[in-house]
Regions:
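Terminal intrinsically disordered, low-complexity extensions flanking WD-repeat/beta-propeller proteins
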Residues: 1-34, 38, 184, 188-215, ...
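Beta-strand-rich domains and repeat architectures in extracellular enzymes and scaffolds
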Residues: 47-77
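Loop/turn segments within WD40 beta-propeller blades
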Residues: 59-67, 108-114, 153-159, 222, ...
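Structural hallmark of WD40 beta-propellers
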Residues: 65-71, 114-118, 139-140, 158-163, ...
Length: 441
């Protein structure tokens, strides 16, 4: 009976079934043929790069039958698709790409269940693309932001609605089905300066924004939107670069008709003591009950979305986060947390055991930034790095091969981590009763 209750609690808190994949994670290997030099250089790029452009974003497809397809987005505005089941016959080559923007692409996200994706770029636009085995075709371009678009994400299981966030501090919601004059899409709604204080300079109110501009109150500045994730169809969670606040928004409201500062329905304020309280990315567990927030203070905080408790439920540490390019994600079952790091490694934690990581992926030589986990099947991980290479990590053989010293270019190494002083105050595994007293972000 106790085991049944434990399993029900794990399901409720987003940890899925009690399958132990630690052995598979321990055997993750990057082979020589799984090391790639990013995406080929844009021949028409206006950027004067003295090195290969970095990969800024990578995501595995969620479309049935295409789960092994990895989308890559580069610093000079190109996107590429990689079949990760195919190992390169000539390693360390660049992937052939398509020019999507003439500026950096900061984020890329797949349309749920489709071979279509959106790209968020430094040229202030979001673009929707149709992908097949032969070509990448532009469907539409979405313009309304004033600054670099940092992130864009679809609503869960919705192929028509997505949101975007930018350095202008604004969040826009777009419906790709909407018809617009001259085929110039406008957002359905918006949250202006979502992580700062603003005043509206126009008296024109409308439920559908017209990309009107708002100015900041003296002494304030727009805080860049760095992460967006939907909890459900009507609830959006956002984080910013400098205000130290996670905000939960009711997207059924029309925030654009209000002249005052937009008010979220819940907020989670930074509880640490560091001056580096900007957030770099958000991840949500499969049951959408636990939020993981990567912070510049070198801690990933988890928060309870069923109670919206103000305090962190748990903390995961041991990596270094010294830039807004360091991202994190979860394994498909929510049992593992993966993050890039400034110290040349990617780190893996067991979500049911907060504290230090259990493994680190060794092989890169600079800051590891974007990371991705294949959505189905045996663990396959992608990591991008400022050393100019991206790597594919697979479950290797249990025993070392004869040519491992040549063929293996990276391994998962176990980590023995001492408990953080604060960790004794945190529950190692969330429980029903724990939700009432545990610290949540």
């Amino acid at each position: 009976m106790k085991n049944i209750v434990n399993k029900l609690e794990q399901r409720y808190t987003g940890f899925g079934t009690n399958l132990d994949h630690d052995i598979a994670i321990r055997r993750l290997i990057c082979y020589y043929c799984d090391v790639y030099r990013g995406v080929s250089v844009n021949p028409d790029s206006h950027q004067d790069l003295t090195r290969d452009p970095f990969i800024f974003a990578c995501k595995f497809s969620t479309s049935a039958g295409w789960e092994d397809t990895l989308a890559l987005a580069s610093e000079d505005g190109r996107i590429a698709l990689q079949d990760t089941t195919v190992k390169s016959e000539e390693p360390h080559l660049s992937m052939e790409g398509t020019t999507a923007h003439y500026n950096a692409i900061f984020d890329i996200n797949w349309m749920p269940g489709e071979m279509k994706l959106i790209t968020a770029s430094g040229d202030h636009s979001i673009k929707l693309w149709d992908l097949d085995e032969e070509k990448i075709t532009l469907i539409n371009t979405f313009n309304c932001h004033d600054r670099c678009v940092k992130t864009a994400v679809f609503r869960p299981e919705d192929k028509s609605v997505f949101v975007s966030g930018a350095r202008d501090g604004n969040i826009f919601l777009w419906d790709i089905r909407a018809k617009h004059p001259h085929d110039h899409p406008k957002p359905d709604s918006g949250i202006y300066n979502a992580h700062g204080t603003t005043k509206v300079l126009t008296s024109h109110n409308s439920s559908r924004p017209r990309c009107r501009r708002r100015s900041l109150i003296s002494g304030e500045r727009a805080q860049s939107i760095t992460g967006l994730v939907f909890q459900d169809d009507d609830t959006l969670i956002s984080c910013g670069a400098g205000d130290g606040v996670i905000k939960v928004w009711d997207m059924r409201k029309h925030y654009t008709i209000h002249k005052k500062e937009p008010l979220p329905k819940h907020t989670f304020k930074y509880k640490g003591n560091s001056t580096q309280y900007g957030f770099t990315s958000l991840a949500i567990c499969p049951s959408r009950l636990i939020l993981y927030v990567n912070c510049r203070d070198n801690v990933i905080y988890s928060y309870n979305l069923s109670s919206y408790n103000q305090n962190p439920m748990a903390e995961y540490y041991g990596h270094r986060n010294e830039s807004y390019y360091v991202k994190s994600c979860l394994s498909p079952d929510g049992k593992y947390l993966l993050s890039g790091s400034t110290d040349e490694f990617a780190y893996i934690w067991k979500t049911s055991k907060p504290g230090g990581p259990i493994f680190k992926l060794c092989g890169h030589t600079e800051e590891v930034t974007s990371v991705a986990w294949k959505p189905y099947g045996e663990p396959v991980i992608a990591t991008a790095c400022d050393d100019g290479y991206h790597r594919i990590w697979r479950v290797g053989l249990e025993n070392k091969g004869e040519n491992d010293e040549i063929e293996v270019q990276g391994r998962a190494e176990p980590i023995t981590f001492t408990m953080h002083p604060q960790q004794s105050k945190l529950e190692s595994t969330p429980t029903f009763s724990g939700f009432k007293k545990s610290h949540l972000f």
